[in-house]
Amino acid sequence: MLGSLSLLWLAAMTTSLVSQPQILTLEDYQEGEEDDVTVATPSLAVRCDYDRCRHLQVSCQELQKVGPVACLCPGLSREDQQPEPPRLGEVQIMAEEGYAVVHWCAPFSPVSHYWLLLWESNGAPQKSAPLNATVRRAELKGLKPGVAYVLCVVAANDAGESNVPGAEVEGPENWTGPSFGPCRKFIMPPKPVTLVYAAVGVGTALALLSCAALVWHFCLRERWGCPRRQGMAQASEAL
């Protein structure tokens, strides 16, 4: 009997030493998952360093390829559609050198190349050679002083070319197209040297006329005498 009691006491002690099972709630389970899993924060997309008015600007699609992270490009029209007209900026005139510098911005369309159209008088315009799609600036040389011109920039791709408003007018003098668009009218002023020569010529002519008037005055005076002196002489004789 004593031995059986000892066995029961030993069994009770062994049972008490065994760890009791722990009941986990759903919240405890979720906290454990949060400790093990690292949440990745998504990186914010940035715009590509693309300026459609920048000279020698590569396409935005090329910038996406070479960038360390993906960047965003402005929306463009489809490649199977003709491009929208570019926007021609101010024309910087160099009157003394006889040329002008033009600058434009690319349209929101795929462009393979540009070219310039220059109207000087009635008839067909002068067409430049094709310009690379990265070009945004060009020089117009050989312009004549005092002449009005109409300049248009045209964008082209495989689907066609952009429209040129007002291209069918008769001469730059009658052109009344919009100033904010692909075309612009400008007038080459006379060269500063020409103005100096004209001023010198006018001054010389005035000086010669003044000298001629003085000579003519003295010649008449010597021939007919001074009217004031003749009147004084007649008055003294009468006295």
Swiss-Prot record:
Residues 20-194 are extracellular. Residues 1-19 form the signal peptide. It comes from the Eukaryota. This is LRRN4 C-terminal-like protein. InterPro entries: FN3_dom, FN3_sf, Ig-like_fold. Keywords: Glycoprotein, Membrane, Signal, Transmembrane, Transmembrane helix. It is found in: Membrane. SUPFAM superfamilies: Fibronectin type III. Residues 82-179 form the Fibronectin type-III domain. One of its GO terms (cellular component) is membrane. It is a single-pass type I membrane protein. Glycans are attached at residues 132, 174. Its main location: membrane. Residues 216-239 are cytoplasmic. The chain crosses the membrane at residues 195-215.
